Regions:
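Long, low-complexity segments enriched in small/aliphatic residues
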Residues: 586-587, 592, 741-835
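Glycine/threonine-rich phosphate-binding loop and adjacent beta-strand/alpha-helix elements that clamp
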Residues: 398, 694-714, 724-733
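Terminal leader/tail segments of proteins
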Residues: 1-21
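A basic, amphipathic helix-loop patch mediating RNA/tRNA/ribosome contacts
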Residues: 37-71
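Short beta-alpha connecting loops at secondary-structure transitions
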Residues: 22-23, 91-97, 207, 452-459, ...
């Protein structure tokens, strides 16, 4: 799909049941009521000159280029020359866009713009892609009567501070598009106009540089700029793109659509695709700019093998690497049994690639020892929503939030983890929706420009279930439940049992206040607001799932949505904000050890039979090992081999020293990745992976939206990830006959009811599809559970609160919770290899001023964080974002060792680790921890082995 040049309609589309017919330059056109004359003209094939107008922003009417002449239905001419961008169409209008008078006015306006603009077009980086240049040609400007006396642009300096784009004020025409984009699209309000008249210029904050300002580098201003004022540095360096392809972002679960603009096989820039249904032409700093990792010097592009992790790596051919891996896996199974090996799928890879890895494990390995990174993030979502609503996924589209009246955010900070969706949510909040935030920290969603939470329930980490039950207690005890909805849509016996449980006095806000640390009055106020405020939508993240009662909390959220009647229509719903680009898809594809694709249990003989017929093997009916079980089995000697595609378990999983010991105990680890990550340091075979720019396939985002990933450059290693898995399966004696990922999707559709109607042809036609997509929903399902729940009747489940085993003590008096930051992503393997590290180059520990003062800790001091699992050292950030008794850090840098501290506690139903609650002590120190010193030695040795050095490596385990 080459979409290098998209049509700009000048103003946003309007939705209306009423249609208006008018005449523009003699052409009859019918448009929805409220449509601007400018947009109607473009739809009629008539382009009106413009500079301040663009269809991603509300009309502004400042440039005066789009003036038109209008005659009303009564034949009277409208006074003056109205701006077509701000004038709505009316029935019977007759519009003239091209008259001698209009041409004269436009040339005069353009002449004024040009009089204070450098005329260096031939050497300008946007030459050939500049709207000012285009408009000068469109209006027929051939000369400028004004001399260059008094020009001020020559003295204005560029701002080069941002690593991704430049700001050249000399080329600014003060159209306000960048300022408006920052306000309307992004919602950061970082830009303004300083000065008056010819002195007017765009300013980031109070005349700060872009890097010093509140700018979050989303790129909306760069995208909106009609001149070279704001220009990507890659465009300056490489020149204008020659062709493009539409693909899908490989970062968070928003799954934004992008145009990869190319020059040959080189990416010039990534531009958010305005017809993308998940992101609507918006982006964040990661998707817009942080794609350089794909060509980073650290990429490993040749297969490598070694016998022991103390041996140097040896580059080999693909055939030798695959045969070596296959022979080692077969040797292990012959010696230790069929269950001694397993595989891990990747949530960064495509649906097709995840499907093939689980297929390889179940066919070539002959067991169900397959798992995915969702184990450590959203496995409780799959379990909890399946039990209550009947499907292991969120209920809504992202666009649904624009119809919400009350938004409840629990354990999530979309501004950091899902920033494009956060911008959409903020837009709705600025329009008047109410906001409740449940979070132990004060995040950007609690308070930011023009956003203020109505309630911030700042609970103690680990007490989610107590709080959600207390909210339900208020609703039931005050008669605020949606009785008709419950009777019609829900299982009444489960409701009555749950109602009896919730109404116990022990679940009242007054009783739970002592547990949660949230005043009862706040709990009551928030509950009343959610129950009575209209359409109520719940959005939650890892602050819900990564707890000992993560699954219980997910069920509690579903209970709250059902009791208030907030499932099954626009503006409501239960919406998990999934972290990685394809974590939803990897789960859909059967990456759990107990489920085949489509969340169907492996023990179901009928389900197994359908797969056995297509796959040509007999499947093991017993569920396999989860990731934590694999580690435990490795340490007891029964699990010896692992195929790990695109997942860094050594950095991302909890209790690092336990994980390291398990990896060292294995005899053959095959890692397939872009870089020699932390897990690869324990590997015996390295198979080079491919980035999202080097492959075809699909991703499924947090709203169940299946979108195409398109190959825009040759694979650095010569193979896409799906081709590597196919080749490994063949080496293991199980041939797979695919020549393109579309064939894999056809097989998925044939075997998976929720994907039955999905095909690459349909994706080409529709752009994207939200599953379920089948005979009953051939175009997909934007909103689930309309008219009835997938499971039949919604089921209420009692959510008894149990305190976590991880409790504060005299030795460990603080609670550590972990999370993410905007500029970095997951374990940082991609973003650390981009300029994003200029914003966040290390993990730091947030600590409240009271706790810091008690320990003699100042801002930026080195501090030791110790738990029962281990110790690491970080710099301190003293801040009131955290409450007293709580500390917080991120996990983006391996040397930080955030997961050295986290423990083996996990969710009771799914083994999702309890990352959000770890009892710790924090004290000032002057040197790295023992683990960090040992890590650095091990890292240096492994880098040496990559270069072919022979060294003796000590284990990365503190005995």
């Amino acid at each position: 799909m080459n979409q290098l040049n998209e049509t700009d309609y000048g103003t946003p589309a309007k939705v209306s049941a009423q249609q208006v017919t008018l005449e523009i330059d003699g052409v009859s056109v019918t448009v929805p009521a409220g449509t601007s004359v400018m947009r109607a003209a473009v739809e009629a094939g008539i382009n009106v000159p413009k500079l301040c107008a663009t269809d991603s922003l509300e009309p502004f009417g400042s440039c005066r280029l789009c003036l038109v002449e209008i005659e009303g239905p009564d034949g009277r001419r409208m006074k003056g020359y109205p701006a077509s961008c701000t004038t709505p169409c009316a029935p019977g209008m007759k519009v003239q866009t091209q008259t001698p008078k209009l041409a004269d006015i436009r040339r005069g306006v353009m002449e004024l713009y040009i009089s204070d603009h450098p005329l260096d077009c031939l050497t300008c980086p946007t030459n050939g892609n500049c709207e000012l240049q285009d408009m000068a040609g469109a209006v027929g400007l051939r000369e400028v009567r004004y001399g260059d006396e008094g020009e001020n642009h020559l003295s204005l300096k560029k701002d080069e501070s941002n690593p991704y784009f430049t700001y050249d004020p000399s080329k600014c025409i003060v159209c306000n598009r960048c300022v408006r984009a920052c306000e309307e699209t992004q919602g950061t309000f970082a830009l303004t106009i300083n000065g008056r008249g010819f002195e007017s210029r765009v300013s980031a904050g109070q005349m700060d540089s872009f890097m010093e300002s509140e700018c979050v580098s989303c790129g909306a201003c760069v995208q909106a700029c009609p001149t070279a004022t704001l220009t990507e540095k890659t465009v300056i360096m490489l020149g204008q793109a020659e062709h493009s392809a539409i693909t899908t972002c490989a970062y968070c679960g928003v799954g934004g659509a992008f145009k990869a603009e190319m020059k040959g096989n080189q990416v010039v820039r990534m531009v958010p695709y305005k017809d993308g249904k998940a992101n609507h032409g918006h982006s964040c700093v990661k998707g817009r700019f942080a794609w350089g990792y794909a060509t980073h010097k650290d990429r490993i592009t040749k297969p490598m093998i070694r016998s022991k992790i103390t041996d140097p790596w040896r580059e080999v051919s693909w055939d030798e690497a695959l045969q070596y891996a296959a022979s080692e896996f077969r040797r292990i199974q012959a010696k230790h049994g069929k269950q001694a090996i397993g595989g891990i799928t990747s949530s960064r890879c495509t649906n097709e690639e995840a499907y093939l890895v689980q297929k390889l494990v179940r066919t070539a390995f002959g067991n169900n020892n397959v798992d995915t990174c969702a184990r450590v993030c959203h496995s409780p979502t799959g379990y909890g929503l399946k039990q209550t609503l009947g499907e292991s996924a969120g209920t809504q589209t992202f666009d649904s939030v624009m119809f919400s009246d009350v938004i409840l955010i629990i354990g999530a900070n979309p501004a950091s983890a899902h920033p494009v969706f956060a911008s959409q949510m903020k837009r709705r909040l600025r329009q008047g929706a109410k906001l409740i935030v449940i979070d132990p920290r004060t995040t950007e969603m609690v308070k930011s420009p023009h956003i203020q939470a109505d309630y911030h329930l700042k609970l103690r980490p680990g007490t989610n279930v107590a709080l959600i039950t207390a909210l339900a207690h208020v609703i039931l005890s005050e008669g605020l439940q949606s009785e008709d909805y419950i009777v019609e849509r829900c299982d009444l016996q489960s409701y009555q049992d749950w109602q009896q449980f919730v109404l116990r006095e022990e679940n009242s806000p007054e009783a739970m206040e002592a547990i949660c640390g949230v005043p009862a009055a706040q709990i009551r106020g928030a509950a009343r607001l959610f129950a009575t405020g209209g359409n109520g939508a719940i959005y939650y993240g890892l602050g819900v799932t990564e707890h000992a009662q993560g699954s219980t909390m997910v069920m509690g959220i579903a209970n709250l949505a059902m009791v208030t009647g907030n499932v099954g229509r626009e503006g409501v719903g239960v919406n998990p904000l999934r972290g990685q680009n394809n974590v939803q898809g990897s789960c859909d594809m059967g990456s759990f050890p107990h489920e085949l694709p489509g969340y169907r249990h492996i023990s179901d003989a009928t389900v197994r039979a359908s797969f056995e017929q297509v796959w040509g093997v007999t499947l093991d009916p017993e569920p396999g090992l989860r990731i934590p079980n694999m580690f435990d089995a490795a340490l007891d000697g029964s699990f010896k081999g692992l195929y790990c595609e695109g997942e860094d378990i050594a950095q991302s999983d909890p209790d690092t020293q336990h994980v390291a010991a398990a990896l060292e105990a294995m005899e053959c680890i095959v890692v397939q990745d872009l870089f020699l990550n932390e897990t690869a340091k324990y590997a015996h075979v390295f198979l080079p992976g491919s980035s999202f720019l080097e492959k075809d396939g699909t991703f499924t985002n947090a709203e169940r939206r299946i979108s195409r990933v398109r190959k825009v450059m040759p694979s650095k290693s010569g193979k896409s990830d799906w081709e590597v898995t196919v080749a490994l399966a063949a080496a293991l004696g199980y041939p797979m006959s695919y020549t393109h990922p579309s064939q894999i999707m056809d097989e998925i559709a044939a075997l998976t009811p929720s994907f039955a109607g999905v095909s690459y042809d349909k994706l080409e036609r529709l752009g994207s599809i939200q599953w379920p997509c089948n005979e009953s929903a051939p175009q997909g399902t934007p909103i689930m559970h309309i008219g009835g729940f997938i499971r039949g009747k919604g089921k209420f489940i009692n959510t008894q609160y149990f305190a976590t085993d991880e409790k504060v003590t005299l030795r460990f008096p603080l609670i550590l919770t972990t999370g993410r930051i905007l500029s970095q992503y997951n374990v940082g393997a991609q973003t650390r290899r981009t300029e994003n590290s200029q914003w966040h180059s290390e993990d730091k520990l947030e600590i409240h001023p009271h706790d810091a003062e008690d320990r003699g800790i100042r801002d930026d001091d080195w501090v030791a964080i110790e738990s029962r699992a281990g110790q690491t050292v970080l710099r301190a950030t003293v801040t009131e974002r955290v409450q007293p008794g709580v500390v917080y850090t991120t996990f983006h840098f391996p040397e930080s060792g955030a997961n050295v501290i986290t423990t083996d506690n996990s969710d009771w139903a799914t083994n999702c680790p309890e990352y959000k609650v770890t009892a710790v002590q924090v004290m000032p120190v002057s040197q790295p921890s023992q683990w960090q010193q040992q890590y650095q030695r091990f890292h240096n040795e492994q880098q040496g082995l990559l270069q072919g050095d022979k060294v003796m490596s000590e284990p990365l385990v503190t005995k």
